[in-house]
Structure formats: structure tokens, C-alpha cells
UniProtKB/Swiss-Prot annotation:
Database matches in Pfam families: ATP-synt_ab, ATP-synt_ab_N, ATP-synt_ab_Xtn, ATP-synt_VA_C
CDD domains named among the record's database cross-references: ATP-synt_V_A-type_alpha_C (cd18111), ATP-synt_V_A-type_alpha_N (cd18119), V_A-ATPase_A (cd01134)
Record-given protein name: V-type ATP synthase alpha chain
One of the record's GO cellular component terms: proton-transporting ATP synthase complex
SUPFAM superfamilies: C-terminal domain of alpha and beta subunits of F1 ATP synthase, N-terminal domain of alpha and beta subunits of F1 ATP synthase, P-loop containing nucleoside triphosphate hydrolases
EC id: 7.1.2.2
Phylogenetic classification of the source organism: Bacteria, Bacillati, Bacillota, Bacilli, Lactobacillales
Species for this entry: Streptococcus pyogenes serotype M5 (strain Manfredo)
Biological process, per Gene Ontology: proton motive force-driven plasma membrane ATP synthesis
Any GO MF annotation of the entry: ATP binding
Binding site for ATP: 233-240
């Protein structure tokens, strides 16, 4: 432990002297109040400390004491359904302990509840050899999540004691005799430094799609379990709603939602909505698989920088148990602004638009911790982390540094479009500018699993939308009537795809989530209409005759998004009705 004294205070940055025995990334207690801070720069005996709490009232001469430990998170039962701040202080228990609706400075509360007891069920027996990552036993944390207690990193040997029963997170539950003869006494909890990624046995190629229930994403721009995606867009385009929708309905085991520097009301929405929503995959409340990290815009700036790392470390812990995890960061731009503020106060040489020169490497560090892995341990298991980051470029300009550095790393770009949002087309993901580099892998995976021709249907639908974009210029100049019959059909089908398929109402109880079989049935109906109508045109039918003759069935196709999942056969039946109606037009003599 090293004690120095403050010589400078500049907002969240404190400089202390007499710190020659301290190390970079050490956690310190700053001032008489004991504020939490982290050393981010050392110059001779002077340490620059990033303080994670409000520094007003702190002055030169006050003491600074190092703990000798890096910023770490507590990992164990009690994480799920909890809401933490950026440095893993539990907000619910913080409020009860301080009897205040505001974050009282200098209050230290353990992240995991020390009084709660958890029923531990051993899976191994005394005498067995264990290595780091082995699952010793389980705790049923919620109705959905079985918390697997693992041997900590760098611990291996013979299991000499293991106890069943109810324990707190600090009670000794097992003992391991290590190779050097020492006895390691383990509890249900372990700690891990947030800036260091948890080790894995092997990184694997992600192939399984993450089904989000959002048609534009699952169809045209899918992300895999273990992939990384970015959602850039201007203000009001719907970034947060897209993030909320994925957090609610993605087919993952656990969701970590990091509210980083955004509005407090958005976290309030999450707290109000999530407990009432039922996960379509498990039938339980969505909160039973969710961890919330709230670092809103009115909370200390420095803690924004830590909140992203806190979230990804918790995600890695659950991944190591063999779970698939999705982490939502809303928004990485606010995190980058926190980096810029600290860099400016440190008087570092600025890069593009004032951001630090190391912005790209920090963003890469975060997204590279996502992926599909084979975990440590003698038991074979795989886990995944899917990282989805919202980016808020000022004025929607995606050429700014945060967006560009993010796009260099992630493989999926869901570009939100202000004109689409103004036309009330939500999700406002622009199908002409967005992309997914997982499209081919996911298409092949689905074709193989479903024994269907899904990838071909997606290609045909996208070709229709691209053809519409090229025809729009002509339509604006000379009008729709100047187009050929075939091109008018293309415009009509493209409108169907846009309005009846891609547009989705997040606030409608049925339309908010669409399962993959329903998506395929809906898209098949639209493409069948295009195919049959195109054949009818080639046989001499008139475009207007086809549109009038199929008006009723097209209306049913448009309404199929509001048909519940259990009536899927009804949607599939529209395919035959489309063919029948067009054949009826031909038989009637629409030539």
C-alpha cells in the first residue's frame, strides 16, 4: 500500500505525488472521502488518477491511498437480474444502504450480496483431478440460469473437499490441493480485472445465426453468435429501440445491457418493460437472463470508460460456463467521448476530431473480446459472446472517427437512415447501405439445417429492392406510367417487401417479434406473387388486371405480419391463393 497526496485536481483527473511504489491500473482511494480512482499514467513519483466519482470539494494536500489491485469485478451468483453502475456498484442495494436516490460519494458496497445464501450442488467428488475452468458444481440462480461454479484460472490439482448446501458467496465451498502442496480454498465467487480478457482454450469460427426476431436483420443482414455488429445512426433514427428489441428477443442464454452515457429515461424504460416481457425461447421473464449496467449521461464521465469493460468481463464469465451471451453497448460514442475528455486533460497529442490517437486500438480491444470459443477445462464446452454496439455520430456523419474505427473491426453494419425514420419506416435500417459479412455463412447454415432454399430467396428479394432503387430516378423524372409492365411489377413487389415485410412495429404485441419459420413463409408469399405475376405478364396479361385481380390476397399477405405464430399454416396457405388468383386472372382473359 502506497500513500501520496493530491497536488492537482482537474475535473475527473487528479494528480498525486509521492506515488513511486504505485503501478499503472492500480485502484486508489482519493481524498478524505475515499473516492474510487484508477491510475492511468505515471511520471516519476506523480500519478495521474482517473476518478470514477464526482471530484468537487476535493483539494490539494488530501491523501491518496493505493490498494495495489487493478479495477476488478466480482463474479458469482447474484449477477443476473441485478443493475450495476459502471464500476459494478449495485444500484438497488446502494439506494437502500444510503437512503438516497443519488450516488453518495465514497460509499463502498460489495458488488455481490454477502448475506444472500445460494444452494450449491456439487458435480465432482473428493479425489478427482481438476484444472482451471472445470465445473465443480451448480447454483440455480434464476428459473432460467444455472450458475456453474468453475475452478479459477491458474488453479489446478486434487479436489480434497467439496460441500453441498446453502452458502454465501464468501463461504469456503471447496478445497484443492495444488501441485506445490498448498491448499486453495475456494468460494462461490471469484474476481477478475476488467481490462484483461479471460483466457480460452481455442477461438472458433462463428457460424450459427443469432435470431433477433427483426425481419430486416435476420433476412438481409444477419449476425452470428460470436459475431460483432455496429448500429450507427443519427439522433432519433431508432438505435436504442433496435438494441432493446435484440436484448428482448435474441435467442441467446444471457443478455448484458450497458447503458453508457445515454439518457436515464432509456434505462428506466428497460426496467419498466423487461420484467413484464416473456422470453419466447424460455417462457420466463426476460429479466431472469439479463444483467444491466447503467452509466447514464448525468453520472461521472470517467465511469463510462469503465462500464464497457465491466460489461464485457461479466459476459466472458458467463461465456466460460458454456452459455451464449449478447452484450449491447449503447452507446460506444459516449464511451469514446469519455476517452477524449481524459486524453485532453492529460494533455496528450490529439488525433482526428480531438479523439486520442489510440482510439482505434481501444475499440478493437473491446470488439475482439467477442467471439465463439472453446473454454478452458477438461470438460468440452463452447461459449459465445455477440457484441452489438450503437454508435451516435454527430449529425449522422458516419465518416467520423468512432464510426470508421468501429467499421474496420465489426463484420455487420446496420446503417440507420434519417429519411427512413422521418417516413416512419422502422426499423430504419437502410437496405442499400447496410451489409453483413456473415450473410453467406448464415445462408449456407440455414439451407443445410432447414433443408430449404433460403439464401436464394434472400438474394432474389434484395435484387428486387436494388432494381427499385435504380428505377426511382426514372419514376421521379417521367412518372410511373412510363415504365414497362415488368418494371411496374418490380416497383409494386419492392413496395410490398418494404412495407409488408421490412417494416416492423416494435410496440405491437405480435409484430414485435417474428420467428424464423414465419419470416420464411412471409417472404415466400411475396416472392411467389412476383414470380407468378411475372409469368402472367410474359403470357400477355396486363399489369393493372393482375393488381386488381390479386388485391384481396395481397391485402392478406400485408396483414400476415399481425397473424400470431401459432397460425403459421394460415400464412403458408397464402402461397397457393396467390397462384390461384393469378391463374384466375389469366383464365378470365386478362389478355
Amino acid at each position: 500500500m502506497n500513500q501520496g497526496k493530491i497536488i492537482t485536481v482537474s475535473g475527473p483527473l487528479v494528480v498525486a505525488s509521492g506515488m513511486q511504489e504505485a503501478n499503472i491500473q492500480d485502484i486508489c482511494r482519493v481524498g478524505h472521502l475515499g473516492l474510487v480512482g484508477e491510475i492511468i499514467e505515471m511520471r516519476r513519483d506523480q500519478a495521474s488518477i482517473q476518478v470514477y466519482e464526482e471530484t468537487s470539494g476535493i483539494g490539494p494536500g488530501e491523501p491518496v491511498v493505493t490498494t495495489g489491485c487493478p479495477l476488478s469485478v466480482e463474479l458469482g451468483p447474484g449477477l443476473i437480474s441485478e443493475m450495476f453502475d459502471g464500476i459494478q456498484r449495485p444500484l438497488d442495494r446502494f439506494q437502500k444502504a444510503t437512503d438516497s436516490d443519488f450516488l453518495i460519494r465514497g460509499v463502498a458496497i460489495p458488488s455481490l450480496d454477502r448475506k444472500a445464501k445460494w444452494a450449491f450442488i456439487p458435480k465432482l467428488s473428493v479425489g478427482q483431478e481438476v484444472v482451471a475452468g472445470d465445473i465443480l458444481g451448480t447454483v440455480q440462480e434464476t428459473a432460467v440460469i444455472e450458475h456453474r461454479i468453475m475452478v479459477p484460472y491458474k488453479v489446478s490439482g486434487t479436489l480434497v473437499a467439496i460441500h453441498a448446501g446453502d452458502f454465501t458467496v464468501t463461504d469456503t465451498v471447496y478445497e484443492i490441493k495444488q501441485e506445490d502442496g498448498s491448499i486453495y480454498q475456494g468460494s462461490l465467487m471469484q474476481t477478475w480485472p476488467v481490462r484483461q480478457s479471460r483466457p480460452v482454450a481455442q477461438k472458433l469460427i462463428p457460424v450459427e445465426p443469432l435470431v433477433t426476431g427483426q425481419r430486416v436483420i435476420d433476412t438481409f443482414f444477419p449476425v452470428t453468435k460470436g459475431g460483432a455488429a455496429a448500429v450507427p445512426g443519427p439522433f432519433g433514427a431508432g438505435k436504442t429501440v433496435v438494441q432493446h428489441q435484440i436484448a428482448k428477443f435474441a435467442n441467446v442464454d444471457i443478455v448484458i445491457y450497458v447503458g453508457c452515457g445515454e439518457r436515464g429515461n432509456e434505462m428506466t424504460d428497460v426496467l419498466n418493460e423487461f420484467p413484464e416481457l416473456i422470453d419466447p425461447n424460455t417462457g420466463q421473464s426476460i429479466m431472469e437472463r439479463t444483467v444491466l449496467i447503467a452509466n447514464t449521461s448525468n453520472m461521472p464521465v470517467a465511469a463510462r470508460e469503465a462500464s464497457i469493460y465491466t460489461g464485457i468481463t461479466i459476459a466472458e464469465y458467463f461465456r466460460d460456463m458454456g452459455y451464449s451471451v449478447a452484450i449491447m453497448a449503447d452507446s460506444t460514442s459516449r464511451w469514446a467521448e469519455a476517452l477524449r475528455e481524459m486524453s485532453g486533460r492529460l494533455q496528450e497529442m490529439p488525433g482526428d476530431e480531438g479523439y486520442p490517437a489510440y482510439l482505434g486500438s481501444r475499440i478493437a480491444e473491446y470488439y475482439e473480446r467477442a467471439g465463439r470459443v472453446r473454454t478452458l477445462g477438461s470438460q468440452e464446452r463452447e461459449g459465445t459472446i455477440t457484441a452489438i454496439g450503437a454508435v451516435s455520430p454527430p449529425g449522422g456523419d458516419i465518416s467520423e472517427p468512432v464510426t470508421q474505427n468501429t467499421l474496420r473491426i465489426v463484420k455487420v453494419f446496420w446503417g440507420l437512415d434519417a429519411p427512413l425514420a422521418q417516413r416512419r419506416h422502422f426499423p430504419a435500417i437502410n437496405w442499400l447501405t447496410s451489409y453483413s459479412l456473415y450473410q453467406d455463412d448464415v445462408g449456407s447454415y440455414i439451407d443445410r439445417k432447414q433443408q430449404s432454399n433460403w439464401s436464394n430467396k434472400v438474394t432474389r428479394a434484395m435484387a428486387i429492392l436494388q432494381r427499385e432503387a435504380s428505377l426511382e430516378e426514372i419514376v421521379r423524372l417521367v412518372g410511373l406510367d412510363s415504365l414497362s409492365e415488368q418494371d411496374r411489377l418490380t416497383m409494386a413487389v419492392a413496395r410490398q417487401i418494404r412495407e409488408d415485410y421490412l417494416q416492423q412495429n416494435a410496440f405491437d404485441s405480435v409484430d414485435t417479434f417474428t420467428s424464423f419459420p414465419k419470416q420464411e413463409a412471409m417472404l415466400t408469399n411475396i416472392l411467389t406473387f412476383n414470380e407468378e405475376a411475372s409469368k402472367a405478364l410474359s403470357l400477355g396479361a396486363y399489369f393493372n388486371e393482375i393488381m386488381e385481380g390479386t388485391a384481396q390476397v395481397r391485402d392478406r399477405i400485408a396483414r400476415s405480419k399481425f397473424i400470431p405464430e401459432e397460425n403459421l399454416e394460415q400464412i403458408k396457405g397464402f402461397t397457393q391463393k396467390v397462384t390461384k388468383e393469378i391463374h384466375h386472372v389469366l383464365a378470365k382473359g386478362g389478355i
